[in-house]
Structure formats: C-alpha cells, structure tokens
Amino acid sequence: MKKIDITGIGIGPFNLGLAALLSHHPEIKSVFLERKPEFRWHEGLLLQGTTLQVPFFADLVTMANPCHHLGYINYLHQHDRLHQFYYYDSFLIPRREYDHYCRWASKQLPDCRFGENVSHVEYDAKLDKFIIESESASGEKQKYISQNLAIGIGTKPRIPKWLETCKHPLVKHSAEFAKIQEQLKQCKQVTVIGSGQSAAECVLALFNSLTPEQVKAGASIRWITRSAGFHPMEYSKLGQECFTPAYMQYFQSLPRDKRRDIAASQGLIYKGISFSTIGDIYDVLYERSVAGEKSGLSLYTSC
C-alpha cells in the first residue's frame, strides 16, 4: 500500500496541469491515474480548422508558473516551431496541436500512469484519508492511501432520454463526430441537436461539405436547440475577469446559496459559441441564399 499526498483520478488537461505543476515540488508525493492507454483530448472533435477558444497562455502551466519547462512556448521550441508560430500570428492555437502538446507533456511526467483503472475509492474516517484501489490492463492491482483527491474524470456525454435506446449507427454524441463525419456527409438529411460550440462545429463542417447539387436534390441540415437562440460565448474583457485569481477568491468568500445563483447565471462564459464560428456559419448561409436559393440549413430554437 502506497502512501500519497494527492491522487488524481482521470488525466485530462486539468489534472495533467496539476501533475505538471507538482513535478516542480518533489516534496509532495502524487500519482495520477487514467484508464486510457495514453492521453487523448476530445479526439472525436479534433476537426480540421478548429482552434481553442482561449489564448495559448491558458496552457497547462504558464498562468501559474511562466518559467515551467512544460509550457506551450517551450513545446514549440522543442519541436522547432517557434518561428512558424510567430508568423502564425494568432493567440488561438489549432486544437490538434493542443492535443499533441498535452501528449508531449504527459510523456515527461512519470507520476501520470496511463492504463490504470481506478476500481474503488472510499474514505477512511479513522485514518482521515482516502483508500484508492486500481488495476492495470495486465491485471496488476495497486492500493493507495491518499490525503487528498483530485477528481478529473470529465463529464459524461448527455444523450436525450428519448434517444438513449436508439441503436442506429449514425445517432451519436458530438464527441464521436470525427469518426462518422464522412458517413454523415452522404446522408440526405442530418439533424444536429444543441447550441454549444461542439454542435456549431459539427454544423459548420457538414454545411461546408454540402454541395448546391445535393441541396437541389433535397439534402438538408437541421440545427435544433431548446434555447431561445444560438448565443455567442461571453468573451468580453470584463467578462473574462471571472477567471482571475482575485475574482475566484471573492467568489469563494460568498455564501453557498449566493455562489450557486451566480454560477447558474454564468453559462455563456463557457457554453456559448465562438464569434468566429457563428460568423463562419452565417457567411456560408448568406452565400448559399443568393438569388433566393435554398441554403440547405434550417435553424430551430425553443424546441
């Protein structure tokens, strides 16, 4: 049984960033466990032309430690891409490169253990510690006693109840879009449900591939949301202040009920669609509707 100061369950960007920062603090014993064999970030949405919605400064470590060796700038340097990035002239990096950057970092962190599935977690009141049991792909079992837990398992894809029992191979969550994108392009009608960034990117990819000839033959895309509209993400300079350490300290000082009310009203800080994606969709809509022609895309709100 191994005694640990902090155990991370799941290795996504948040726990990977924590592992990277802790690598400069050897006095803190840590381990991070992930059942997947290697780091992969939203592989079903690593679409050509997509970027992060936040500047590259929000990498794994820079905002906490700008001198850290696992920062994005050093990643570029190590891959001989620093000058190309300078000429790229954008704060928003390609999503595929962010995934590659995270995989590069994960391979330099021995405390990140991939292919190790956490099978049981319990709190021992007598020890005032957590007991974590895990098993590797080869069947090797481990047990850890940990003072702290960092849960980073991500969110479960949400499927509407009325679709949960549907077994059609092309009824999928957007997290699997890249796997079925080519098949969807051959469908006469496609419906996309949801009005977040992922849904918008699926719509844009399908819309760009829809030819005028297909539209004339009856092909179409329907974009449906229960929201009142297809809203942009809050990305104003004042809005971004919600992510500063000063605001977080203020937020944590508020009563629990107040924090819940505020959090419930801040959905568009992270749930909306980027201005650029909205603009790209509208531009295609405009061009496709010249001379009253059908664009091939219909939008439905409040459904």
Where are these regions (language model features)?
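Tryptophan-centered motif/residue detector
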Residues: 41, 45, 72-75, 104
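N-terminal/domain-start segments enriched in small and hydrophobic, helix-friendly residues
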Residues: 33, 53-58, 66-69, 217-222
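Short, intrinsically disordered/low-complexity patches at protein termini
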Residues: 54-56, 64-66, 246, 255-257
